[in-house]
From Swiss-Prot:
UniProt-recorded Gene Ontology molecular function terms: DNA binding
One annotated Gene Ontology cellular component of this protein: cytosol
Native source species: Bacillus licheniformis (strain ATCC 14580 / DSM 13 / JCM 2505 / CCUG 7422 / NBRC 12200 / NCIMB 9375 / NCTC 10341 / NRRL NRS-1264 / Gibson 46)
Lineage: Bacteria, Bacillati, Bacillota, Bacilli, Bacillales
Name of the protein in question: Nucleoid-associated protein BLi00029/BL02358
Compartments in which it is found: Cytoplasm, Nucleoid
SUPFAM superfamilies with a match to the protein in the record: YbaB-like (SSF82607)
Keywords, sorted A to Z: Cytoplasm, DNA-binding
Segments of this protein annotated with the region Disordered: 1-27
Keyword Cytoplasm attributed: yes
Keyword set includes DNA-binding: yes
Biased composition range(s): Low complexity: 8-17
Quaternary context: Homodimer.
Protein function: Binds to DNA and alters its conformation. May be involved in regulation of gene expression, nucleoid organization and DNA protection.
Length: 107
């Protein structure tokens, strides 16, 4: 019976280590800055790992008072591009912790 208890303690230590490693990875992700672009780099949106927009850069030559809708579309596309990159990096980083576990939609 003693062997079963030792295995349980070992498993608990592994779980605690994994939890600590996951927390560290999440903190590192939060500090990452990813960029999305649109219009051949005319609009750039920077987003942190928590999906907060931290900067929007619009090149002057794309600003046309006669075509505000195009600029809106470019900002939207660049933002979605940046958010997609955050999702990709998050899945890549956190996926190593959930590999082999059946936990759909966790990250």
């Amino acid at each position: 019976m003693r062997g079963g208890m030792g295995n349980m303690q070992k498993m608990m230590k592994q779980m605690q280590k994994m939890q600590k490693d996951m927390q560290k990875a999440q903190e590192e992700l939060a500090e990452k800055v990813l960029e999305g672009t649109a219009g051949g780099g005319m609009v750039t949106v920077k987003v942190n790992g928590q999906k907060e927009v931290i900067d929007v850069i619009i090149k002057e030559e794309v600003v046309d008072p006669e075509d505000v809708e195009m600029l809106q579309d470019l900002v939207l596309a660049a933002t979605n591009d940046a958010l997609k990159k955050v999702d990709e990096v998050t899945n890549e980083t956190m996926g190593k912790f959930t590999k082999g576990m059946n936990m759909p939609g966790l990250f």
